[in-house]
A protein has these predicted regions:
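Short, positively charged and aromatic/hydrophobic N-terminal segments
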Residues: 6-16
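N-terminal type II signal-anchor transmembrane helix
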Residues: 21-61, 65
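Cleft-lining beta-strand/loop regions that shape enzyme active-site pockets
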Residues: 66-186, 315-442
Length: 608
């Protein structure tokens, strides 16, 4: 009996041993299978991605009877790029580059297969200087004799400003036109910060340097209100004149429409007011498109998008004019560790390296520095100014200002050979400031954290957020700010060939629209990027030339890597979600990453 039990136990144990061997064998096979499957997925996935990108980047020929569709939707970036993550997920973000739009319009003008442009209105987030550049390109397109037709279910004020350039403007029978004038609503967070126990200590130069008001005041100062009023009046004046010229409507009438909120009128009133040429549904517009572009009713209309035009190549002849894009807040070094990415920053150290490389590149005969920035680090601005000075010794440098080139954005290129700005560009703001957060109340009273000190010198703990600056420290800082302001002012004096008194009279942090900046010699000419390129070629004495954009756009692999990390994708999602509140949000978010001394635009206006 005992022997039988032992034999049974042995048999059971032996069976378990066999089962465990089988188990590990099956697990191993499964793991190997998963690895092989993963490799296959990666290989075919990579092949699919390469196929997608290659097809998107392949050179295209425009079909006969094509129409360029200018879809005014999403947010406008200074430079466009392929949304690799969106291509993979089928959820491409609504962002298009100003460079792509301008290039597409220019190519459409010169392409005999493109009959005209169809403007489709949506929700389009763009500043007026960029809109002005697009509008001017559309006006230039019309010089070819080709037509433009515009249609919208609704028109925002900014989109109507663009659409009014069209030969025919149509609206949905149940649509509306938002026409109300321009207002500015600066945001103030002093009381919010006070609730959490934070206050800022500020040292600044310039009565108009109101960038700090957002944190230390609850309303606009008189100088800030004065320059803001002048700024929005300048923009509105341009909008009125442009619409008046295109639609043949008296400026006084347009103001009357805004004051009476014609936005909420019966759509038929828009026709009577000459704001639109007719009320049509989407399917009816197609017939109008064919009629206007000289096509038979049965002829197909081939639609070509702005991004499609990237792959329509033009001949590159002559010498190279480099167009270097610098847009976003100015920082000393790359911002790392952010879930939102940092693609919308001007990194001073990187720009200096790039400009140095352009100076040494014998193929580059002239450089256009395209600036769209409200400023940032005063230190980085000075370093870039110096690099422009070195670049100038070897080849002409022309600055093209976008929506804004103010404070540090003006500083970095004020010594260029020539400066071109749009009439509605925000520029100037010659001044600097320092802001130091005092978090002592948050830390000690709100959170109950106590601090003690051990130090070697009297001011060893200078700049600590755990205590406010004392009067002596503020005095030292003020003298440093004064020196920085004097240097900024001198850079403008030397770059613009003005006297100290002339610059001081227009400095103090004062901002100007491009038209007014021309009068006081802060800029040399009004116009867009195209005009700046032509000027650069002229200064370099080039009869034939082509342009090359710098820095080079990220490769699809770099974009995919960035997309997989989520940073830039989240940044674009945030931009699309917050819209006009994106810039002030990012300013608040990055305050602790910025250098203490700032040369920054005096406000984020939240223009409506």
């Amino acid at each position: 009996m005992t022997l039988l039990i032992k034999l049974s136990i042995f048999a059971f144990s032996n069976q378990n041993i066999i089962s465990m061997k089988d188990f590990f064998k099956y697990v191993g096979a499964t793991v190997v299978g998963l690895i092989v499957f993963g490799l296959i997925v990666v290989i075919f996935g990579t092949m699919s991605i390469v196929g997608l990108i290659s097809s998107a980047q392949a050179t295209q020929n425009v079909s006969k009877n094509s129409v360029l569709v200018l879809n005014l939707s999403g947010s406008l970036a200074e430079q466009g790029s392929d949304d690799v993550w969106g291509m993979l997920t089928g959820n491409e973000l609504g962002s298009v580059g100003l460079d792509d739009i301008l290039s597409a319009i220019k190519k459409a003008k010169n392409n005999d297969r493109i009959k005209g442009i169809y403007i489709e209105s949506g929700i389009f987030l763009a500043n007026y200087a960029s809109r002005q550049e697009i509008r001017n390109a559309l006006l230039d397109f019309k010089k070819s004799g080709k037509k433009i037709i515009a249609y919208g279910d609704n028109y925002t004020q900014g989109n109507y400003y663009l659409a009014s350039v069209a030969d025919k403007v149509f609206l949905n029978p149940q649509g509306m036109i938002d026409w109300h004038g321009i207002g500015a609503q600066p945001m103030f967070v002093k009381d919010l910060l006070k609730k959490v126990g934070i206050q800022y200590q500020v040292v600044k130069v310039g009565k108009y340097k109101s960038a700090t008001e957002m944190y230390i005041a609850d309303k606009m100062s008189d100088p800030s209100r004065e320059q803001t009023q002048a700024y929005i009046d300048g923009i509105w004046s341009d909008v009125l004149k442009a619409v008046s010229d295109s639609r043949k409507i008296n400026v006084d009438k347009l103001n009357q429409y805004a004051d009476s909120l014609i936005t909420f009128s019966n759509p038929k009133d828009y026709v009577d007011a000459k704001l639109v040429d007719g009320l049509l549904y989407t399917n009816q517009v197609k017939d109008e498109v064919k009629k206007m572009f000289g096509l038979d009713k049965d002829d197909p209309v081939n639609q070509v998008g702005v991004t499609d035009m990237r792959s329509v190549k033009e001949e590159s002849e002559g010498k190279q004019v480099a167009v270097y894009y610098a847009y976003g807040s100015i920082v000393d070094n790359p911002v790392t560790g952010s879930m939102f990415g940092a693609e919308h920053m001007i990194v001073g150290s990187e720009v200096c390296k790039d400009l140095e490389a352009l100076a040494e590149d014998d193929d580059v005969k002239a450089v256009v520095l395209r600036i769209n920035s409200g400023g940032g680090s005063a230190y980085a601005s000075e370093q870039m100014w110096n690099q422009v000075e070195q670049l100038k010794k070897k080849k002409p440098v022309v600055v093209s200002m976008g929506d804004m080139a103010a404070s540090g954005g003006y500083y970095m290129g004020c010594n260029a050979n020539w400066i071109v700005a749009q009439p509605t560009t925000l520029t100037g703001s010659i001044g600097i400031f320092a802001m130091i957060p005092d978090m002592s109340q948050l830390l000690t009273q709100k959170l109950g954290i106590k601090f003690d000190e051990v130090k070697t010198n009297k001011n060893s703990t200078f700049g600590s957020s755990a205590r406010p600056l004392n009067a002596e420290e503020i005095g030292y800082l003020a003298r440093y700010i004064d020196r920085g302001y004097a240097l900024f002012r001198q850079r403008v004096v030397d770059g613009r060939k003005l006297s100290v008194n002339q610059v001081e009279a227009i400095a103090q942090g004062h901002v100007f629209v491009g038209r007014d900046a021309l009068k006081i010699k802060l800029v040399d000419e009004l116009g867009g990027l195209e005009k700046a390129v032509e000027k650069a070629a002229k200064l370099a004495k080039l009869d034939e030339f082509y342009t090359q954009d710098y820095p080079a756009k990220a490769s699809w692999m770099d974009q995919l890597t960035g997309a997989m990390s989520g940073g830039n994708y989240l940044d674009e999602q945030l931009r699309a979600t917050l819209g006009e509140y994106y810039e002030p949000f990012m300013l608040l978010k990055t305050m602790n990453q910025q250098s203490m001394i700032q040369a920054r635009i005096p406000f984020y206006l939240n223009i409506r």
